[in-house]
């Protein structure tokens, strides 16, 4: 069972609803709750220290993100992503990120290009000391999508973010995958710096293909 320390909501200026949602989402992504595990409202109220209404609102949002699902006569459970689910998600991710890389070359400002390179340097430093690069990679992709200038594309990617991040966490847990992932990000930056939009798109798609293969291996190891 997840500890109260993980989920406890602090009394800060941030809205309670946002804190509950963030804490529950992170607990799922960090696998404090196992896929298929039932989430009991009463227990979540005790762990977080918030009202049942706040818990229900958070669970509805997590359902919209695809992280939990409601099963008749059982209640809310943590979603289980199968290898087929992952394959379909990464097909879509390949299209989205390939286009994002292309549009970044075509539309990004010099400041956005510098920001992307700076973020990769941050990822390098984290990887060098075997620290988690998940959040730093999230920021890298944010810069990439924003720099492309297509709001609809960014919104579509954001709608899949929670499920993809859960799978990314799995893939990066494989020995050697984090360093290979960082090397692939360098390939993306190199392609962007070349000014070749199609080359950047290919580098992004290649990175997603390799990540997808890693996810499949990670899911197979869990079964």
Label for each model-derived stretch:
Residues 209-219:
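Short arginine-rich
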Residues 176-177:
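Hinge/beta->alpha junction and helix N-cap segments in small-molecule ligand-binding domains
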Residues 108-170, 182-190, 199-209:
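Conserved amphipathic alpha-helical segments that form helical-bundle/coiled-coil interaction surfaces
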Residues 37, 69-70, 137, 180-182:
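Short, flexible turn/loop "capping" segments at secondary-structure junctions
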Residues 1-106, 217-223:
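Short linear motifs at protein or domain termini
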Residues 73, 96, 118, 180-183:
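Alpha-helix N-cap/N′ positions at the starts of helices
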Residues 87-94, 172, 201, 205:
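Short amphipathic alpha-helical segments with heptad-repeat character
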């Amino acid at each position: 069972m997840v500890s109260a320390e993980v989920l406890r909501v602090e009394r800060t200026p941030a809205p309670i609803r946002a804190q509950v949602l963030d804490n529950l989402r992170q607990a799922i992504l960090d696998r404090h709750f196992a896929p298929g595990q039932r989430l009991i409202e009463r227990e979540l109220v005790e762990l977080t220290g918030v009202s049942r209404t706040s818990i229900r609102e958070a669970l509805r949002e997590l359902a919209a993100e695809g992280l939990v699902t409601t099963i008749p006569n059982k209640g809310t459970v943590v979603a289980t992503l199968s290898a087929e689910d992952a394959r379909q998600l990464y097909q879509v991710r390949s299209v989205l990120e390939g286009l994002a890389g292309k549009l970044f070359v075509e539309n990004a400002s010099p400041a956005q290009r510098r920001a992307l390179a700076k973020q990769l340097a941050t990822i390098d430093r984290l990887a060098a000391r075997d620290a988690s690069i998940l959040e730093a990679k999230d920021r890298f992709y944010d810069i990439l999508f924003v720099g492309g200038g297509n709001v609809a594309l960014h919104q579509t990617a954001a709608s899949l973010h929670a499920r993809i991040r859960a799978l990314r966490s799995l893939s990066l847990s494989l020995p050697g995958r984090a360093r290979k992932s960082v090397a692939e990000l360098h390939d993306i930056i190199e392609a962007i710096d070349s000014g070749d939009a199609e080359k950047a798109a290919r580098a992004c798609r290649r990175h997603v293909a390799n990540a997808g293969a890693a996810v499949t291996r990670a899911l197979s190891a869990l079964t």
